[in-house]
């Protein structure tokens, strides 16, 4: 039967993707418990609440995975991992009628647990099951119901033929389901209650559907044990279902394959706790913590114990991870089965937390699977196991049998190479090496004895020089300390004392290390109390100098450097040296190792990592008082490795043999390296900062001003008509009363004042600038005319008011003021920059209509005022005249105040030195933005109201406050946003284009660290960002915003090609091998022309490369760069292309600017900067670089490949 005709839509996780998942988990710093708590808490606003015991869909699964990995996981990886958790978990509430029968037909190949060796090809089965589920939801009953029996007779023939095809698998499936669904974990048969390892594909791995009985779980077993385990599972069931299952198949089985393409596994859900358990195996941490976390996670009823199903679910995920890690599942399964039997110490059918942790910690393969750290030292004699694949035939040191397997065959101790099977590791003796002695006065003398490990010797005997035949079984002996290999028969002729071999002066023997005395241990505990909180090693050690000629190595390894080769080198050094000489920098830093070696008079430090690792160790050495300053060597594991190139250690570790490297460190010479101190001081912003006028902003203003004077012709005609009507009305009302005319004059004056104060700020801005187009000239001319007209109107109105003349003067002033107000309104509409034609048109029409209505109301009031005035004059006499004189004097004072306010607003517009506001208010009277001025109030304030003058003054004060707020300087950026990564320069410091590339590189690496897992990938990414920066040119015209002073002499950066970057070089190589200072052509010509008897030629004029200034009369063309001369080199970079040309050799060097001992750099804007490859964005500041000190470094010996007879003659 072949139902997998069509290819599945989704594939499971491949081994390559599993390695990628492991790598992503190693980059992450998030804790799985914290991520689960965030997803389970109801306060998480960004993500919906997830129940740990519930199921999640693909979207929730991907959010959880991204949160744990602290980056965006690849989509294909997330899909395939999600599918690996699917399984056909059938429940009574979800299977109806013929869906059960069709599922039973498929169950012969359906095993969808998270990927084991027997779960391949299960996705098509799941697809078929899920596709058939909607069709069966409406018909038939549940499992064992009457609906399935009712339709059995009509399909008897179909059932008969189908059962013949699948060989009775339906009955077996029914038998298994009927017994297991009613199974009670607390009620078991004669078999041990914890031993329920079954091959049922329906109960292995995470569930595909929502299960109504979550306790029904079991472990997918090996195919070789399927028959026995199946019967064993049946015996464990205390009850059997009395119902029968009748198969009803309407469609041919070939139709199942056709429906595969319509099924999408992403519509299903997977259990969240299975996902968490699976990921916890990949998370770094202590095995004890992982065991407790798994226990709490699967203890769904919170009763403090695990039953059989919960135990099986945990082991299920361990089996899935074990296969991807290269385990032989057939070897691991018996170990887990034995553990499940022995873990229940009180035989009560359940496992408590103590029993679970005790059983887990005594199962060595389980500890390796849980992620036990293979680099953490334990007590002497305890092996540090590591799962290993052997390229040559290997034999178990315990059972003496060969390790057989396709993947990783067995466990090997990292420290002594003791090798065992997984099944034998439980009984392996604690025979590992001793790394220290407990007393300074050993009982059996102070000599170190050989530590022999038998078997797996591939080489020649150190005594008889004959090859050791290790292919035929356990034969041969190897000393762990001196690495001497002997035949078994030759071992008796060798002394018992070990000499530590060829590199004895580099190794600290165990006899030289002992626990620290109490007083020192107490001081160390107090000094390192914070650093030791997360470490469980309570004993501190001290080293006694073993010999006057010894110079031991102190090795620091950074496993997270760019090449990701640290773990391998760490294990090799732990085997070649004393393990207490090797430290992992990711676990506490370098202080622990430096504290142990600080009293030694001679030792050397080896940094396995990039340039940042070297800087980290140098910084730690500054904080510790050492008896002597050790020399530092470098094994390049980083991306750039510029310092390693300068010291001849190469641009990257190429897998060279560790003994050869140790020989180079022994023969290396010592040189001095300068270190420079850098001080960065932020520049405070000046109070009178003005916005810089650029060409773009200037053209934008020209466009706005040219649009502001455009007025619709129809609106102009309407305005002129209304103005003519107002003049006629004013002329006809020649008999109006003086009080009424004064009131109207005051009203129009108030309107003019508010309009002028609102709009003269923007219109006078145009006056202060140089007019370049016709539109600007028009605006300026209209503004000047308006100012003159308003002054004339104010003078005439004030004179007419003070004189108290009758109707004629008031009528003229009234007409004049009305026309001026209309003109002000016209220019107001013109001076405001138009946002849209419709808005201006509507606002202007509204203004004209309001003016027309006001004129009509004034005409009616004046007609009523004439009649009332005649009656009052006839009835009143002298008292009325006195009151009128008092009112007129009060009105004169108010008019004088208004005149002063308008004059003040006009005078403010004439001052060019004061800051101006380029933005005007909207024409509709609303506040458009922060720079706009408040619009005119709806009800104008007249001088007859009591608070008229005070209201106008308040408006003026508010406007002045707004102008002051607009001109405040920008808030200074906080120091936290631009933190300098280092205060010491070891390699180089740069500003500009190269730092901009580095900023982009680091931001992308923090977002997607899995894309930067090799040196080649890092260089390709760097090239991509350099290409984009070439076109972006974000740091062009650097000379306009930076000043450089070298030893008191300012450099003229504007002389010559414009620069985009400046770099200060302490070492010759930067950016992964670029020699920016370069070796000039003149030096090459001198070296080639000067023979053994020849004289050097003079430099030609074309060979000289001058700097921007004649810097202290030093000819920079012949200046030689040296990282120990207490001088720093300053070079300029034109662009990214310039850097590439220097890197490829098309150009000799960068632009040499200076060679000095002190540099001061002042920047005027924010620039990208970097120190030794660590970038950041720096606001305007002052940078001072001075010499700090010198440290000894190890220079590798020259390569011997070039030596020979002909090279000797030519040298």
UniProtKB/Swiss-Prot annotation:
Gene3D superfamilies (alphabetical): 2.60.200.40, 3.30.60.20, Diacylglycerol kinase alpha (1.10.238.110), EF-hand (1.10.238.10), Probable inorganic polyphosphate/atp-NAD kinase, domain 1 (3.40.50.10330)
EC number: 2.7.1.107
Positions annotated to bind Ca(2+) 1: 299, 301, 303, 310
Region of interest called Disordered, as start-end residue ranges on this chain: 174-244, 789-841, 874-893, 910-958
InterPro entries in the cross-refs: ATP-NAD_kinase_N (IPR017438), C1-like_sf (IPR046349), C1_DGKbeta-like_rpt1 (IPR047471), DAG_kinase_typeI_N (IPR029477), DGK (IPR037607), DGK_typeI_N_sf (IPR038199), Diacylglycerol_kin_accessory (IPR000756), Diacylglycerol_kinase_cat_dom (IPR001206)
A Gene Ontology BP annotation from the UniProt entry: phospholipase C-activating G protein-coupled receptor signaling pathway
Record field: catalytic activity: a 1,2-diacyl-sn-glycerol + ATP = a 1,2-diacyl-sn-glycero-3-phosphate + ADP + H(+)
SMART domains, A to Z: C1, DAGKa, DAGKc, EFh
GO molecular function per UniProt: ATP binding; ATP-dependent diacylglycerol kinase activity; calcium ion binding; zinc ion binding
Sequence ranges of Low complexity compositional bias: 231-244, 795-805, 931-958
Zinc finger (Phorbol-ester/DAG-type): 382-432, 449-498
General function of this protein: Upon cell stimulation converts the second messenger diacylglycerol into phosphatidate, initiating the resynthesis of phosphatidylinositols and attenuating protein kinase C activity. May have a role in the development of the embryonic nervous system and the function of the adult nervous system and muscle; regulating signal transduction in neurons.
Name listed for the protein in its UniProt record: Diacylglycerol kinase 1
Gene: Dgk
């Amino acid at each position: 039967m072949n139902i997998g005709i069509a290819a599945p839509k989704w594939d499971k996780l491949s081994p390559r993707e599993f390695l990628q998942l492991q790598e992503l988990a190693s980059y992450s710093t998030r804790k799985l418990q914290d991520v689960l708590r965030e997803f389970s808490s109801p306060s998480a606003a960004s993500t919906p609440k997830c129940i740990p015991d519930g199921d999640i869909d693909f979207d929730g699964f991907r959010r959880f995975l991204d949160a744990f990995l602290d980056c965006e996981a690849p989509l294909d990886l997330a899909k395939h991992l999600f599918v690996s958790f699917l399984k056909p978990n059938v429940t009574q509430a979800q299977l109806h009628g013929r869906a059960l029968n069709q599922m039973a037909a498929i169950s012969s190949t359906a095993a969808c647990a998270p990927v084991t060796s027997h779960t391949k090809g299960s996705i098509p089965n799941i697809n078929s099951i899920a596709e058939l589920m909607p069709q069966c939801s409406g018909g038939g009953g549940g499992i064992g119901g009457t609906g399935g029996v009712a339709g059995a007779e009509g399909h008897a023939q179909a059932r008969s033929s189908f059962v013949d095809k699948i060989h009775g698998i339906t009955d077996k499936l029914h038998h298994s389901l009927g017994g297991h669904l009613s199974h009670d974990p607390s009620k078991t048969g004669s078999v041990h209650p914890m031993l329920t390892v079954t091959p049922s594909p329906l109960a292995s791995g995470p569930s595909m559907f929502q299960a109504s009985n979550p306790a029904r779980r079991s472990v997918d077993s090996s195919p070789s044990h399927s028959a026995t385990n199946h019967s064993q599972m049946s015996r464990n069931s205390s009850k059997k279902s009395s119902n029968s299952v009748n198969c009803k198949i309407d469609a041919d089985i070939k139709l199942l394959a056709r429906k595969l393409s319509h099924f999408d596994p992403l519509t299903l859900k997977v259990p969240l706790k299975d996902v968490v358990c699976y990921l916890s195996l990949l998370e770094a941490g202590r095995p004890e913590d992982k065991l407790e976390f798994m226990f709490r996670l699967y203890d769904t009823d919170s009763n403090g114990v695990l039953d059989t199903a919960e135990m099986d679910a945990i082991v299920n995920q361990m089996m899935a991870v074990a296969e991807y890690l290269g385990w032989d599942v057939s070897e691991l399964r018996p170990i887990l089965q034995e553990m499940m039997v022995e873990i229940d110490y009180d035989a009560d059918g359940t496992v408590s937390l103590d029993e679970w942790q005790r059983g887990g910690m005594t199962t060595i393969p389980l500890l390796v699977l849980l992620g036990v750290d293979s680099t953490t030292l334990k007590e002497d004699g305890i092996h540090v196991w590591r799962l290993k694949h052997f390229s040559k035939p290997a034999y178990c040191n315990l059972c003496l049998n060969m390790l057989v397997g396709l993947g990783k065959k067995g466990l090997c101790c990292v420290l002594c190479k003791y090798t065992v099977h997984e099944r034998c590791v439980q009984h392996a003796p604690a025979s590992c090496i001793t790394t220290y002695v407990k007393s300074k006065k050993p009982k059996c003398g102070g000599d170190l004895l050989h530590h022999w490990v038998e078997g797996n010797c591939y080489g020649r005997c150190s005594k008889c020089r004959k090859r050791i035949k290790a292919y035929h079984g356990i034969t041969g002996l190897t000393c762990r300390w001196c690495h001497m290999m002997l035949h078994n028969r030759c071992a008796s002729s060798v002394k018992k004392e070990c000499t530590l071999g060829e590199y004895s002066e580099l190794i600290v023997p165990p006899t030289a290390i002992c626990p620290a005395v109490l007083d020192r241990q107490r001081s160390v505990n107090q000094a390192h109390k914070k650093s030791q909180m997360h470490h469980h090693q309570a004993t501190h050690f001290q080293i006694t100098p073993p010999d006057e000629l010894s110079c031991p190595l102190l090795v620091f390894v950074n496993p997270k450097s760019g090449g990701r080769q640290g773990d391998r080198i760490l294990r090799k050094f732990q085997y070649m040296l004393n393990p207490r000489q090797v430290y992992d920098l990711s676990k506490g830093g370098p202080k622990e190792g430096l504290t142990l070696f600080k009293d030694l008079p001679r030792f050397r430090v080896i940094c396995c990592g990039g340039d940042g690792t070297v800087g980290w160790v140098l910084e730690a050495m500054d904080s510790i008082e050492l008896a002597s300053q050790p020399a530092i060597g470098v094994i390049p594991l980083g991306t750039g490795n510029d310092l390693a190139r300068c010291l001849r250690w190469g641009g990257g570790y190429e897998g060279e043999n560790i003994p050869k490297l140790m020989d180079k460190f022994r023969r290396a010479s010592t040189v001095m390296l300068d270190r420079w101190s850098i001080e960065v001081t932020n520049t405070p912003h000046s109070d009178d900062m003005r916005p810089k006028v650029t060409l773009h902003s200037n053209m934008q203003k020209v466009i706005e001003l040219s649009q502001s004077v455009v007025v619709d012709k129809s609106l102009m005609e309407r305005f002129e008509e209304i103005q003519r009507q107002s003049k006629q009305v004013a002329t006809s009302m020649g008999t109006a009363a003086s009080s009424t005319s004064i009131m109207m004059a005051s009203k129009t004056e108030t309107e003019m004042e508010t309009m002028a104060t609102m709009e003269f700020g923007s219109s006078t801005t145009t006056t202060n600038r140089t007019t370049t187009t016709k539109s600007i000239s028009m605006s300026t001319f209209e503004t000047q005319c308006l100012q003159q007209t308003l002054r004339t109107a104010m003078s005439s109105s004030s004179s007419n008011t003070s004189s108290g003349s009758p109707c004629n003067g008031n009528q003229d002033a009234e007409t004049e003021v009305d026309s001026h107000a209309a003109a002000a309104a016209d220019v107001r509409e013109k001076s405001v920059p138009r946002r849209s034609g419709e808005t201006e048109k509507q606002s202007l029409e509204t203004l004209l209509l309001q003016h027309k209505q006001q004129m009509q109301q004034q005409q009616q009031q004046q007609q009523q005022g004439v009649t009332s005035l005649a009656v009052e004059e006839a009835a009143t006499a002298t008292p009325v005249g006195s009151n009128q004189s008092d009112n007129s004097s009060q009105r004169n004072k108010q008019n004088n105040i208004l005149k002063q306010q308008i004059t003040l607003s006009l005078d403010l517009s004439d001052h060019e030195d004061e800051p101006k506001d380029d933005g005007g208010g909207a024409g509709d009277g609303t506040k458009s933005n922060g720079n706009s001025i408040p619009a005119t109030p709806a009800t104008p304030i007249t001088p007859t109201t009591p608070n008229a003058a005070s209201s106008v003054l308040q408006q003026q004060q508010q406007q002045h406050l707004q102008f002051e707020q607009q001109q405040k300087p920008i808030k200074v950026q906080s120091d936290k946003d631009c933190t300098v990564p280092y205060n010491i320069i070891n390699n180089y410091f740069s500003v500009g284009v190269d730092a901009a590339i580095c900023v982009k590189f680091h931001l992308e690496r923090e977002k997607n660290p899995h894309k930067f897992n090799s040196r080649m990938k890092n260089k390709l990414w760097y090239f991509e960002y350099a290409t984009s920066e070439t076109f972006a040119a974000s740091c062009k015209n650097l000379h306009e915003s930076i000043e450089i002073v070298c030893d008191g002499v300012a450099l003229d950066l504007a002389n010559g090609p414009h620069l985009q970057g400046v770099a200060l070089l302490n070492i010759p190589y930067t950016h992964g091998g670029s020699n920016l200072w370069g070796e000039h052509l003149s030096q090459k010509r001198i070296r080639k022309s000067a023979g053994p008897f020849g004289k050097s030629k003079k430099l030609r004029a074309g060979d000289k490369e001058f700097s921007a200034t004649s810097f202290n009369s030093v000819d920079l063309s012949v200046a030689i760069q040296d990282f120990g001369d207490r001088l720093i080199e300053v070079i300029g970079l034109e662009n990214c292309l310039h850097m590439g040309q220097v890197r490829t050799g098309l150009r000799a060097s960068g632009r040499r600017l200076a060679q000095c001992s002190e540099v001061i750099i002042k920047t005027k804007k924010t620039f990208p900067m970097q120190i030794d490859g660590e970038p950041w964005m720096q606001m305007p500041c002052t940078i001072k670089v001075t010499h700090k000190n010198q440290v000894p470094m190890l220079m590798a010996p020259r390569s011997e490949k070039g030596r020979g007879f002909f090279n000797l003659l030519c040298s």
